């Protein structure tokens, strides 16, 4: 279920400070974040965030198309290794 419009988008408070500090420094370094639940805002466009997936930080370059989505959507937590193969049919 979607979030109510009157509540506005959810963003952890510390992300604003990190984003502003990164913009002020002028360097495009990766901003490490653990907040997968935060919504991507227009202020974050052009910045690179390292979103934690439970194992490592995956770099996410924020574009205009990502605004309104959550950070967690762009760093998958599970790796699909495929279903087990049928060993009998592969024998020649």
Swiss-Prot record:
Q: GO terms for biological process?
A: ribosomal small subunit assembly; translation
- Region ranges (Disordered): 72-92
Q: Name one GO molecular function term.
A: structural constituent of ribosome
Disulfide bonding pattern of the chain: none
Q: Which PROSITE patterns does the annotation name?
A: RIBOSOMAL_S19 (PS00323)
Stored InterPro entries: Ribosomal_uS19, Ribosomal_uS19_bac-type, Ribosomal_uS19_CS, Ribosomal_uS19_SF
One Pfam family named in its UniProt record: Ribosomal_S19
Q: What domain of life does the UniProt record list for this protein's source? A: Bacteria
Any idea which UniProt keywords this protein has? Ribonucleoprotein, Ribosomal protein, RNA-binding, rRNA-binding
Extract one GO cellular component term from the record.
small ribosomal subunit
Q: Which SUPFAM superfamilies match?
A: Ribosomal protein S19
- Protein's UniProt keywords contain Ribonucleoprotein: yes
PANTHER family recorded for this chain?
A: RIBOSOMAL PROTEIN S19P FAMILY MEMBER (PTHR11880), SMALL RIBOSOMAL SUBUNIT PROTEIN US19M (PTHR11880:SF8)
Q: Which family does it belong to?
A: Belongs to the universal ribosomal protein uS19 family.
Q: Main role?
A: Protein S19 forms a complex with S13 that binds strongly to the 16S ribosomal RNA.
List the protein's name. Answer: Small ribosomal subunit protein uS19
Organism encoding this protein = Gluconobacter oxydans (strain 621H)
């Amino acid at each position: 279920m979607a979030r109510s419009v009157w509540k506005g988008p959810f963003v952890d408070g510390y992300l604003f400070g990190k984003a502003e500090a990164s913009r002020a420094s002028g360097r495009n370094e990766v901003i490490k974040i653990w907040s997968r639940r935060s919504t991507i805002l227009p202020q974050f466009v052009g910045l690179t965030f390292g979103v934690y997936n439970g194992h490592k930080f995956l770099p996410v370059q924020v574009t205009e198309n990502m605004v309104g989505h959550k950070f967690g959507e762009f760093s998958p937590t599970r790796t699909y290794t495929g279903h087990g193969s049928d060993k009998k049919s592969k024998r020649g």
